[in-house]
Amino acid sequence: MRLVLLFSCVLAVSSYAEIILAHSDENLLSRTKNNLSKWNENRLYDYGSKSTMSLPVSSLFPALQTLWIGVVADCSYVTHFTSRMEAKKHIFQEFEGVSTLYEDSFNINVQIHSLILPSAHDCSANVVDRPEISMSPRISIEEKLEIFSKWKYESPGNNVFEAISPHERESFPSEPQVSVLFTSSVKRSPHGVSWFATICSETHIENEWHVGPLSVVSAYPNDRLVVAHEIGHILGLIHDCNKKSCGDHSEACCPLSSSLCDAQELYIMNPSNSYTYANLRFSDCSILQLHSLVEKKYVSLSCLSKPSEKSVLRLGTCGNGIVEDGEECDCGEDCENNPCCDGKTCKLTKGSLCDDQQDACCYQCHFKNAGTLCRQSTNPCDKPEFCTGISSKCPVDENWDDGRICQDSLGMGSCASGVCTSASRQCKKLTNFSSLSCHSDSCKVSCQNEDGTCFISAKDYIDGTRCRGGLCYNGVCVPIEGSSASWSKQPSLFCASGTMLISLAVIAWFFW
Protein backbone atom coordinates (compact mmCIF):
# COMPACT_ATOMS: atom_id res chain seq x y z
CA MET A 1 0.00 0.00 0.00
CA ARG A 2 1.29 3.44 -0.85
CA LEU A 3 0.18 6.40 1.21
CA VAL A 4 -0.11 10.00 0.14
CA LEU A 5 -0.61 12.32 3.09
CA LEU A 6 -0.29 16.05 3.54
CA PHE A 7 0.51 17.25 7.02
CA SER A 8 1.98 20.23 8.77
CA CYS A 9 4.51 20.16 11.58
CA VAL A 10 3.67 23.72 12.53
CA LEU A 11 1.66 23.40 15.72
CA ALA A 12 -0.12 26.36 17.21
CA VAL A 13 -0.17 26.64 20.98
CA SER A 14 -2.61 24.07 22.33
CA SER A 15 -4.45 24.02 25.63
CA TYR A 16 -3.62 20.34 25.98
CA ALA A 17 -1.69 19.74 29.19
CA GLU A 18 1.26 18.02 27.57
CA ILE A 19 2.60 21.17 25.97
CA ILE A 20 1.86 23.54 28.81
CA LEU A 21 5.10 23.75 30.77
CA ALA A 22 5.51 24.94 34.31
CA HIS A 23 8.42 25.84 36.55
CA SER A 24 9.12 25.15 40.21
CA ASP A 25 10.02 28.79 40.84
CA GLU A 26 7.01 30.64 42.29
CA ASN A 27 7.52 33.73 40.13
CA LEU A 28 7.51 31.68 36.97
CA LEU A 29 4.51 29.67 38.15
CA SER A 30 2.52 32.88 38.47
CA ARG A 31 2.77 33.51 34.75
CA THR A 32 -0.11 32.64 32.47
CA LYS A 33 -0.22 29.32 30.64
CA ASN A 34 0.30 31.14 27.34
CA ASN A 35 3.60 32.52 28.59
CA LEU A 36 4.62 29.14 30.00
CA SER A 37 4.00 27.50 26.64
CA LYS A 38 6.17 30.00 24.76
CA TRP A 39 9.15 27.67 24.63
CA ASN A 40 7.19 24.88 23.02
CA GLU A 41 5.53 27.31 20.63
CA ASN A 42 8.91 28.49 19.35
CA ARG A 43 10.25 24.97 19.25
CA LEU A 44 7.35 23.76 17.17
CA TYR A 45 7.75 26.62 14.70
CA ASP A 46 11.43 25.74 14.41
CA TYR A 47 10.33 22.34 13.14
CA GLY A 48 7.73 23.78 10.81
CA SER A 49 7.45 22.17 7.40
CA LYS A 50 4.92 20.81 4.97
CA SER A 51 5.65 17.49 3.41
CA THR A 52 3.86 15.44 0.81
CA MET A 53 5.06 11.85 0.72
CA SER A 54 4.34 8.77 -1.34
CA LEU A 55 6.28 5.85 0.08
CA PRO A 56 5.44 2.36 1.29
CA VAL A 57 5.53 2.37 5.09
CA SER A 58 7.70 -0.76 5.19
CA SER A 59 10.55 1.06 3.45
CA LEU A 60 10.64 4.10 5.71
CA PHE A 61 12.66 2.59 8.57
CA PRO A 62 14.53 -0.42 7.14
CA ALA A 63 17.15 -0.81 9.91
CA LEU A 64 16.21 -1.82 13.46
CA GLN A 65 17.51 0.68 16.03
CA THR A 66 17.46 0.72 19.83
CA LEU A 67 16.24 3.63 21.96
CA TRP A 68 17.56 3.40 25.52
CA ILE A 69 15.34 4.71 28.33
CA GLY A 70 16.40 5.78 31.82
CA VAL A 71 13.48 5.15 34.18
CA VAL A 72 12.87 6.75 37.57
CA ALA A 73 9.91 5.80 39.77
CA ASP A 74 9.22 8.19 42.63
CA CYS A 75 7.83 7.38 46.08
CA SER A 76 4.26 8.29 45.14
CA TYR A 77 4.39 5.78 42.27
CA VAL A 78 5.78 2.80 44.20
CA THR A 79 2.88 3.02 46.67
CA HIS A 80 0.78 1.31 43.98
CA PHE A 81 2.72 -1.90 44.68
CA THR A 82 3.30 -4.21 47.63
CA SER A 83 7.03 -4.52 46.92
CA ARG A 84 9.86 -3.13 44.80
CA MET A 85 9.94 -6.46 42.97
CA GLU A 86 6.30 -6.05 41.94
CA ALA A 87 6.91 -2.46 40.81
CA LYS A 88 9.97 -3.49 38.80
CA LYS A 89 8.08 -6.31 37.09
CA HIS A 90 5.24 -3.96 36.14
CA ILE A 91 7.66 -1.40 34.67
CA PHE A 92 9.40 -4.09 32.60
CA GLN A 93 6.05 -5.35 31.32
CA GLU A 94 4.93 -1.86 30.33
CA PHE A 95 8.14 -1.15 28.41
CA GLU A 96 7.91 -4.45 26.58
CA GLY A 97 4.52 -3.19 25.38
CA VAL A 98 6.00 0.19 24.41
CA SER A 99 8.78 -1.54 22.48
CA THR A 100 6.26 -3.63 20.53
CA LEU A 101 4.39 -0.48 19.50
CA TYR A 102 7.56 1.24 18.28
CA GLU A 103 8.98 -1.81 16.54
CA ASP A 104 5.74 -2.31 14.59
CA SER A 105 5.57 1.32 13.44
CA PHE A 106 9.13 2.70 13.34
CA ASN A 107 11.44 -0.32 13.62
CA ILE A 108 12.66 1.11 16.93
CA ASN A 109 13.39 -1.25 19.80
CA VAL A 110 12.74 0.49 23.15
CA GLN A 111 14.83 -0.86 26.03
CA ILE A 112 15.33 0.05 29.69
CA HIS A 113 18.89 1.29 30.12
CA SER A 114 18.66 1.93 33.86
CA LEU A 115 16.13 2.04 36.66
CA ILE A 116 15.98 4.09 39.85
CA LEU A 117 13.45 2.50 42.19
CA PRO A 118 13.33 3.87 45.76
CA SER A 119 13.17 1.54 48.73
CA ALA A 120 10.74 1.83 51.62
CA HIS A 121 13.58 3.39 53.64
CA ASP A 122 14.22 6.00 50.93
CA CYS A 123 10.57 7.03 50.97
CA SER A 124 10.07 6.96 54.74
CA ALA A 125 13.15 9.10 55.22
CA ASN A 126 11.67 11.64 52.76
CA VAL A 127 15.15 12.73 51.76
CA VAL A 128 15.09 16.28 50.40
CA ASP A 129 18.40 15.81 48.60
CA ARG A 130 16.72 13.34 46.21
CA PRO A 131 14.13 15.48 44.40
CA GLU A 132 13.73 12.87 41.68
CA ILE A 133 11.92 10.51 44.09
CA SER A 134 10.48 12.76 46.80
CA MET A 135 8.03 14.98 44.90
CA SER A 136 4.56 15.30 46.41
CA PRO A 137 1.56 13.89 44.47
CA ARG A 138 -0.01 17.35 44.86
CA ILE A 139 2.68 19.04 42.76
CA SER A 140 1.46 19.57 39.21
CA ILE A 141 2.88 17.29 36.56
CA GLU A 142 4.30 20.35 34.76
CA GLU A 143 6.25 21.35 37.88
CA LYS A 144 7.52 17.79 38.18
CA LEU A 145 8.88 17.94 34.63
CA GLU A 146 10.92 21.04 35.46
CA ILE A 147 12.18 19.54 38.75
CA PHE A 148 13.04 16.27 36.99
CA SER A 149 14.76 18.12 34.14
CA LYS A 150 16.78 20.28 36.53
CA TRP A 151 17.86 17.19 38.48
CA LYS A 152 18.96 15.50 35.27
CA TYR A 153 20.80 18.65 34.11
CA GLU A 154 22.70 18.96 37.40
CA SER A 155 23.51 15.25 37.63
CA PRO A 156 25.42 14.23 34.48
CA GLY A 157 28.77 12.66 35.30
CA ASN A 158 27.52 11.71 38.76
CA ASN A 159 26.40 8.33 37.42
CA VAL A 160 22.79 8.97 38.45
CA PHE A 161 21.79 6.30 35.95
CA GLU A 162 23.58 3.03 36.55
CA ALA A 163 23.31 0.36 33.87
CA ILE A 164 20.77 -2.17 35.04
CA SER A 165 23.08 -5.10 34.32
CA PRO A 166 26.66 -4.32 35.40
CA HIS A 167 28.21 -7.45 33.85
CA GLU A 168 26.95 -6.23 30.46
CA ARG A 169 27.79 -2.57 31.08
CA GLU A 170 30.27 -2.17 28.25
CA SER A 171 27.50 -2.94 25.74
CA PHE A 172 25.31 -0.11 27.07
CA PRO A 173 25.61 3.56 26.08
CA SER A 174 26.89 5.66 28.98
CA GLU A 175 23.63 7.59 29.24
CA PRO A 176 20.03 6.83 28.22
CA GLN A 177 18.70 8.76 25.23
CA VAL A 178 15.35 9.48 26.92
CA SER A 179 14.53 9.73 30.62
CA VAL A 180 11.06 8.99 32.01
CA LEU A 181 9.73 9.67 35.51
CA PHE A 182 6.84 7.55 36.73
CA THR A 183 4.79 9.39 39.35
CA SER A 184 1.31 9.69 40.82
CA SER A 185 -0.90 12.73 40.76
CA VAL A 186 -4.04 13.87 42.54
CA LYS A 187 -5.63 13.93 39.10
CA ARG A 188 -7.42 10.69 38.29
CA SER A 189 -7.09 10.66 34.52
CA PRO A 190 -3.91 9.33 32.87
CA HIS A 191 -1.67 12.08 31.62
CA GLY A 192 1.89 12.95 30.76
CA VAL A 193 4.13 15.84 29.80
CA SER A 194 7.35 16.02 27.79
CA TRP A 195 9.72 18.36 25.95
CA PHE A 196 8.85 18.44 22.27
CA ALA A 197 11.31 17.30 19.57
CA THR A 198 14.31 16.98 21.89
CA ILE A 199 15.50 13.50 20.92
CA CYS A 200 19.30 13.13 20.79
CA SER A 201 19.88 16.44 22.56
CA GLU A 202 21.51 16.91 25.94
CA THR A 203 19.60 18.49 28.80
CA HIS A 204 20.37 22.21 28.72
CA ILE A 205 19.03 25.59 29.83
CA GLU A 206 16.94 27.40 27.25
CA ASN A 207 14.83 30.47 28.00
CA GLU A 208 14.96 29.74 31.75
CA TRP A 209 13.82 26.13 31.31
CA HIS A 210 15.84 22.98 31.81
CA VAL A 211 15.11 21.34 28.47
CA GLY A 212 15.92 17.87 27.19
CA PRO A 213 14.54 14.48 26.11
CA LEU A 214 12.59 13.93 29.32
CA SER A 215 9.03 13.02 30.20
CA VAL A 216 6.86 12.69 33.29
CA VAL A 217 4.02 10.16 33.25
CA SER A 218 1.20 9.71 35.76
CA ALA A 219 -0.97 6.99 34.28
CA TYR A 220 -0.88 3.82 36.38
CA PRO A 221 -1.95 1.19 35.39
CA ASN A 222 -2.06 2.43 31.75
CA ASP A 223 1.59 3.48 31.68
CA ARG A 224 2.55 1.97 28.33
CA LEU A 225 0.10 3.99 26.24
CA VAL A 226 1.00 7.32 27.82
CA VAL A 227 4.74 6.54 27.70
CA ALA A 228 4.44 5.68 24.00
CA HIS A 229 2.54 8.94 23.41
CA GLU A 230 5.11 11.06 25.27
CA ILE A 231 8.11 9.46 23.57
CA GLY A 232 6.31 10.30 20.33
CA HIS A 233 6.34 13.99 21.28
CA ILE A 234 10.04 13.78 22.18
CA LEU A 235 10.61 12.41 18.66
CA GLY A 236 8.67 15.37 17.23
CA LEU A 237 5.26 13.79 16.57
CA ILE A 238 2.20 16.04 16.74
CA HIS A 239 -1.29 14.96 17.77
CA ASP A 240 -3.71 13.10 15.57
CA CYS A 241 -6.63 15.20 14.38
CA ASN A 242 -9.89 15.03 16.31
CA LYS A 243 -13.27 16.70 15.89
CA LYS A 244 -12.13 19.85 17.66
CA SER A 245 -8.92 20.42 15.71
CA CYS A 246 -10.65 19.53 12.44
CA GLY A 247 -13.50 21.92 13.19
CA ASP A 248 -11.79 25.05 14.46
CA HIS A 249 -8.28 24.55 13.01
CA SER A 250 -6.86 25.46 16.44
CA GLU A 251 -3.75 23.36 15.85
CA ALA A 252 -2.02 21.48 13.11
CA CYS A 253 -2.59 17.76 13.41
CA CYS A 254 -2.21 14.40 11.69
CA PRO A 255 -5.33 13.53 9.65
CA LEU A 256 -6.77 10.07 9.18
CA SER A 257 -6.12 10.17 5.44
CA SER A 258 -5.69 12.59 2.56
CA SER A 259 -9.48 12.92 2.36
CA LEU A 260 -10.60 12.46 6.00
CA CYS A 261 -9.49 14.72 8.83
CA ASP A 262 -10.78 13.17 12.10
CA ALA A 263 -8.61 10.23 13.20
CA GLN A 264 -11.50 9.13 15.47
CA GLU A 265 -9.30 8.64 18.56
CA LEU A 266 -7.96 5.38 17.16
CA TYR A 267 -4.21 5.86 17.54
CA ILE A 268 -1.41 6.50 20.03
CA MET A 269 -1.10 10.23 19.30
CA ASN A 270 -4.76 10.89 20.07
CA PRO A 271 -4.79 14.20 22.01
CA SER A 272 -7.35 12.98 24.55
CA ASN A 273 -6.12 11.65 27.87
CA SER A 274 -8.73 8.87 27.90
CA TYR A 275 -6.45 6.12 26.62
CA THR A 276 -7.78 2.64 25.97
CA TYR A 277 -6.20 -0.50 24.64
CA ALA A 278 -7.90 0.24 21.32
CA ASN A 279 -5.06 2.74 20.78
CA LEU A 280 -2.48 0.08 20.02
CA ARG A 281 -0.73 1.54 17.00
CA PHE A 282 0.50 4.78 15.49
CA SER A 283 -1.41 6.30 12.62
CA ASP A 284 0.02 6.18 9.11
CA CYS A 285 0.33 9.96 9.32
CA SER A 286 2.53 9.73 12.44
CA ILE A 287 4.75 7.15 10.75
CA LEU A 288 5.17 9.34 7.68
CA GLN A 289 5.70 12.44 9.79
CA LEU A 290 8.68 10.98 11.68
CA HIS A 291 10.23 9.79 8.43
CA SER A 292 9.85 13.27 6.96
CA LEU A 293 11.34 14.97 10.04
CA VAL A 294 14.39 12.68 9.89
CA GLU A 295 14.80 12.99 6.11
CA LYS A 296 14.63 16.78 6.26
CA LYS A 297 16.96 16.80 9.30
CA TYR A 298 14.47 18.57 11.56
CA VAL A 299 15.19 15.84 14.11
CA SER A 300 18.10 13.44 14.37
CA LEU A 301 18.01 9.82 15.45
CA SER A 302 21.80 9.55 15.35
CA CYS A 303 22.02 8.75 19.07
CA LEU A 304 20.03 5.54 18.65
CA SER A 305 22.15 2.41 18.54
CA LYS A 306 22.16 -0.90 16.75
CA PRO A 307 20.43 -3.58 18.80
CA SER A 308 22.55 -6.08 20.65
CA GLU A 309 20.85 -9.22 21.89
CA LYS A 310 23.55 -9.50 24.53
CA SER A 311 22.51 -6.25 26.16
CA VAL A 312 18.75 -6.50 25.81
CA LEU A 313 17.05 -7.18 29.14
CA ARG A 314 13.57 -8.66 29.11
CA LEU A 315 11.24 -10.47 31.45
CA GLY A 316 12.07 -14.14 31.76
CA THR A 317 15.85 -13.63 31.85
CA CYS A 318 18.20 -14.27 34.76
CA GLY A 319 19.83 -11.01 35.80
CA ASN A 320 16.91 -8.60 35.42
CA GLY A 321 16.38 -8.38 39.18
CA ILE A 322 12.93 -10.00 39.05
CA VAL A 323 12.33 -13.49 40.43
CA GLU A 324 10.41 -15.42 37.78
CA ASP A 325 9.41 -19.00 37.01
CA GLY A 326 12.37 -21.36 37.39
CA GLU A 327 14.37 -18.90 39.53
CA GLU A 328 14.96 -19.06 43.27
CA CYS A 329 16.38 -15.55 43.39
CA ASP A 330 17.59 -12.78 41.08
CA CYS A 331 20.08 -10.31 42.50
CA GLY A 332 20.04 -8.15 39.35
CA GLU A 333 22.64 -5.39 39.56
CA ASP A 334 23.78 -6.03 43.14
CA CYS A 335 25.11 -9.61 43.09
CA GLU A 336 28.56 -8.73 44.46
CA ASN A 337 26.99 -7.71 47.78
CA ASN A 338 24.55 -10.62 47.94
CA PRO A 339 25.86 -13.83 49.59
CA CYS A 340 22.47 -15.54 49.31
CA CYS A 341 22.01 -15.58 45.53
CA ASP A 342 24.16 -16.85 42.65
CA GLY A 343 23.76 -14.15 40.01
CA LYS A 344 24.81 -16.45 37.17
CA THR A 345 22.24 -19.17 37.83
CA CYS A 346 19.59 -17.26 39.80
CA LYS A 347 19.68 -20.05 42.37
CA LEU A 348 20.23 -19.75 46.13
CA THR A 349 23.81 -20.33 47.23
CA LYS A 350 24.69 -23.47 49.20
CA GLY A 351 23.19 -23.39 52.70
CA SER A 352 20.92 -20.42 51.94
CA LEU A 353 17.20 -20.74 52.56
CA CYS A 354 16.22 -17.33 51.21
CA ASP A 355 17.49 -14.01 49.86
CA ASP A 356 17.66 -10.99 52.20
CA GLN A 357 17.17 -8.58 49.30
CA GLN A 358 14.07 -10.37 48.13
CA ASP A 359 11.98 -11.16 51.21
CA ALA A 360 11.12 -9.27 54.40
CA CYS A 361 11.40 -12.35 56.65
CA CYS A 362 14.92 -13.29 55.60
CA TYR A 363 18.10 -12.38 57.50
CA GLN A 364 21.58 -13.59 56.61
CA CYS A 365 20.04 -16.03 54.13
CA HIS A 366 17.84 -17.74 56.77
CA PHE A 367 14.26 -17.30 57.99
CA LYS A 368 13.70 -14.66 60.67
CA ASN A 369 12.33 -15.81 64.01
CA ALA A 370 8.57 -16.16 64.43
CA GLY A 371 7.02 -12.97 65.79
CA THR A 372 9.49 -10.61 64.10
CA LEU A 373 7.66 -7.55 62.77
CA CYS A 374 7.86 -7.49 58.97
CA ARG A 375 5.17 -4.94 58.05
CA GLN A 376 4.16 -2.07 60.30
CA SER A 377 0.58 -0.93 60.69
CA THR A 378 -0.09 2.08 58.47
CA ASN A 379 -3.27 3.21 60.24
CA PRO A 380 -5.53 2.13 63.16
CA CYS A 381 -7.43 -0.28 60.90
CA ASP A 382 -4.39 -1.96 59.36
CA LYS A 383 -2.97 -4.98 61.17
CA PRO A 384 0.78 -5.28 61.67
CA GLU A 385 2.23 -8.48 60.18
CA PHE A 386 4.83 -10.76 61.76
CA CYS A 387 7.13 -13.43 60.37
CA THR A 388 6.03 -17.04 60.86
CA GLY A 389 9.50 -18.53 61.31
CA ILE A 390 8.86 -21.11 58.57
CA SER A 391 8.83 -18.83 55.53
CA SER A 392 10.82 -15.91 54.16
CA LYS A 393 7.63 -14.20 53.01
CA CYS A 394 5.84 -11.61 55.10
CA PRO A 395 2.19 -12.71 55.52
CA VAL A 396 -0.46 -11.08 53.36
CA ASP A 397 -1.38 -7.56 54.46
CA GLU A 398 -4.65 -7.70 56.39
CA ASN A 399 -7.02 -5.15 57.94
CA TRP A 400 -8.90 -5.28 61.23
CA ASP A 401 -12.53 -6.36 60.94
CA ASP A 402 -15.06 -3.85 59.66
CA GLY A 403 -16.97 -2.18 62.50
CA ARG A 404 -14.06 -2.32 64.96
CA ILE A 405 -13.79 0.87 67.05
CA CYS A 406 -10.76 2.97 66.09
CA GLN A 407 -9.23 6.33 66.88
CA ASP A 408 -6.94 8.56 64.85
CA SER A 409 -6.07 12.25 64.62
CA LEU A 410 -9.67 13.04 63.62
CA GLY A 411 -11.15 11.32 66.66
CA MET A 412 -13.22 8.19 67.19
CA GLY A 413 -14.54 6.14 64.30
CA SER A 414 -14.90 2.57 63.13
CA CYS A 415 -12.95 0.49 60.65
CA ALA A 416 -14.32 0.18 57.12
CA SER A 417 -12.33 -1.42 54.29
CA GLY A 418 -9.09 -0.75 56.14
CA VAL A 419 -9.64 2.91 57.04
CA CYS A 420 -10.82 4.61 60.22
CA THR A 421 -13.97 6.48 59.25
CA SER A 422 -17.64 7.14 60.01
CA ALA A 423 -20.71 8.25 58.12
CA SER A 424 -20.23 11.79 59.44
CA ARG A 425 -16.57 11.88 58.33
CA GLN A 426 -17.58 10.84 54.84
CA CYS A 427 -20.18 13.63 54.77
CA LYS A 428 -17.55 16.17 55.78
CA LYS A 429 -15.16 14.91 53.11
CA LEU A 430 -17.75 14.98 50.32
CA THR A 431 -19.42 18.31 51.11
CA ASN A 432 -18.23 21.82 51.72
CA PHE A 433 -20.34 22.40 54.80
CA SER A 434 -21.89 19.28 56.31
CA SER A 435 -20.17 17.28 59.03
CA LEU A 436 -23.32 15.46 60.17
CA SER A 437 -24.71 12.29 58.71
CA CYS A 438 -28.37 11.40 58.88
CA HIS A 439 -30.82 8.64 57.98
CA SER A 440 -28.76 5.88 59.58
CA ASP A 441 -30.88 3.12 58.01
CA SER A 442 -29.51 4.07 54.58
CA CYS A 443 -26.13 3.11 53.18
CA LYS A 444 -26.25 5.94 50.67
CA VAL A 445 -24.24 8.98 51.71
CA SER A 446 -26.78 11.03 53.66
CA CYS A 447 -25.84 14.43 55.03
CA GLN A 448 -27.65 17.12 56.99
CA ASN A 449 -27.32 20.81 56.23
CA GLU A 450 -27.60 23.71 58.68
CA ASP A 451 -31.39 23.94 58.61
CA GLY A 452 -31.80 20.24 59.34
CA THR A 453 -32.56 19.11 55.80
CA CYS A 454 -31.21 15.63 55.06
CA PHE A 455 -29.99 14.87 51.57
CA ILE A 456 -29.49 11.33 50.30
CA SER A 457 -27.15 10.86 47.34
CA ALA A 458 -26.67 7.96 44.97
CA LYS A 459 -23.13 7.47 46.31
CA ASP A 460 -22.59 4.51 48.65
CA TYR A 461 -20.80 4.73 51.96
CA ILE A 462 -17.46 2.92 52.04
CA ASP A 463 -18.01 -0.82 52.44
CA GLY A 464 -17.91 -1.67 56.15
CA THR A 465 -19.28 1.69 57.35
CA ARG A 466 -21.64 1.34 60.30
CA CYS A 467 -25.37 1.57 59.74
CA ARG A 468 -28.19 0.94 62.21
CA GLY A 469 -27.75 -2.63 63.41
CA GLY A 470 -25.21 -3.64 60.80
CA LEU A 471 -22.56 -2.69 58.26
CA CYS A 472 -22.90 -1.20 54.78
CA TYR A 473 -21.88 -3.32 51.78
CA ASN A 474 -22.65 -2.33 48.18
CA GLY A 475 -25.10 0.30 49.39
CA VAL A 476 -27.11 -2.10 51.59
CA CYS A 477 -27.17 -2.28 55.41
CA VAL A 478 -26.34 -5.90 56.24
CA PRO A 479 -27.55 -6.91 59.74
CA ILE A 480 -25.06 -8.46 62.13
CA GLU A 481 -26.29 -11.15 64.52
CA GLY A 482 -26.29 -10.12 68.17
CA SER A 483 -25.37 -6.58 67.27
CA SER A 484 -27.99 -4.82 69.38
CA ALA A 485 -26.06 -5.04 72.66
CA SER A 486 -22.74 -3.90 71.29
CA TRP A 487 -24.24 -1.20 69.14
CA SER A 488 -26.37 0.21 71.97
CA LYS A 489 -23.23 1.54 73.65
CA GLN A 490 -22.37 3.65 70.61
CA PRO A 491 -23.76 7.11 69.92
CA SER A 492 -26.79 7.07 67.70
CA LEU A 493 -26.05 7.70 64.03
CA PHE A 494 -29.55 9.06 63.47
CA CYS A 495 -29.91 12.80 62.97
CA ALA A 496 -32.52 14.01 65.45
CA SER A 497 -33.54 17.27 63.84
CA GLY A 498 -36.76 19.19 64.31
CA THR A 499 -37.58 18.98 60.64
CA MET A 500 -36.39 16.05 58.52
CA LEU A 501 -36.75 16.44 54.79
CA ILE A 502 -35.43 13.50 52.77
CA SER A 503 -34.43 14.52 49.30
CA LEU A 504 -34.18 11.58 46.90
CA ALA A 505 -32.66 13.72 44.17
CA VAL A 506 -28.94 13.51 43.57
CA ILE A 507 -27.50 16.99 43.90
CA ALA A 508 -24.20 16.80 42.12
CA TRP A 509 -22.94 20.18 43.20
CA PHE A 510 -23.70 19.33 46.82
CA PHE A 511 -21.28 16.44 46.87
CA TRP A 512 -18.72 17.48 44.31
From Swiss-Prot:
Superkingdom in the source lineage: Eukaryota
Post-translational modifications: Glycosylated.
Residue stretches making up the Peptidase M12B domain: 65-306
Protein role: Has a role in the development of the spore envelope.
EC number(s) reported in the record: 3.4.24.-
Residues at the active site: 230
Organism: Schizosaccharomyces pombe (strain 972 / ATCC 24843) (Fission yeast)
GO terms (BP aspect): ascospore wall assembly; proteolysis
One GO MF term attached to the UniProt entry: metalloendopeptidase activity
Domain Disintegrin: 315-402
Cofactor(s) demanded: Zn(2+)
Protein name listed in UniProt: Zinc metalloprotease mde10
Localisation: Endoplasmic reticulum; Spore wall
Binding site for Zn(2+): 229, 233, 239
